Amino acid sequence: MIKDKVIIITGASSGIGEAAAKLLASKGAKVVLGARRTDKLEQIVDEIQKNGGEAIYQELDVTKQSENDAIVNLAREKFGRVDVIFLNAGLMPSSPVSALKTDEWHRMVDVNIKGVLNGVAAVLPVFIAQKSGHVIATSSVAGLKPYPNGAVYGGTKWFVRDFMEVLRMESAMEKTNIRTATIYPAAINTELLGTITDKGAAASMKETYDTYGISPDRIASVVAFAIDQPDDTTISEFTVGPANQPW
């Protein structure tokens, strides 16, 4: 059941995170939203509250362990527990390796990999103490197969896939009742394209998204479906994308 669950969402200021926040709040969840753009978070929380939902927010840079710890503490102080964390923050500045956009490589590692690690490190002690919890992470179809221009981005998303699967296995072995779900979106209309600075990669991705892109609401509904399963059931992976996109 989703109702009354306390759910932390990172990368919540737009796209998939925003859509998930609104949907889960409409189903009775208490959502705790984190992102760097607090003006956007304030607008989303205000809309949720006006519609009768419960939501709070805090500025969050997922690359900083202290800020991940702080949002978990906020959720516990306000609502008394944490039931789910949805690790959704991410960047996609795709480019060919030969472009040597090394600053972007390191930024993707910091956000897409370390952001997931920091979020899990912040919440895992709480979940272990509770003997319950649910970790959901956004990977990508680029975490399932290689694509030109996606060597580093795809590598970060392959990491998420492997890390989440091992977390699932270890949690089962340790009998902590911690569920996991990893989501592999294809062309979903979000602000990710805005992070691409390479002109060739940007043009190619824009054409793909203009042709196939679908609403982030589709991913939000999958997140809700995963959370809504009985506590003894894990659905560990979802690949979701446009019906006509040959990803």
Regions of interest found by a model, annotated:
Residues P96-V97, E104-R107:
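Substrate-binding pocket helix/loop in short-chain dehydrogenase/reductase
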Residues S140:
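Residue(s) in the substrate-gating loop at a strand-loop-helix junction
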Residues S13-S14:
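Conserved glycine-rich cofactor-binding loop
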Residues V120, T156:
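Active-site helix of classical SDR
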Residues K27-I44:
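Conserved glycine-rich Rossmann-like NAD(P)H-binding loop of the short-chain dehydrogenase/reductase
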Residues I178-I183, A202-W247:
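C-terminal helical subdomain
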Residues T38-D39, E59-A70, T102:
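The beta1-alpha1 cofactor-binding region of Rossmann-like NAD(H)/NADP(H)-dependent oxidoreductases
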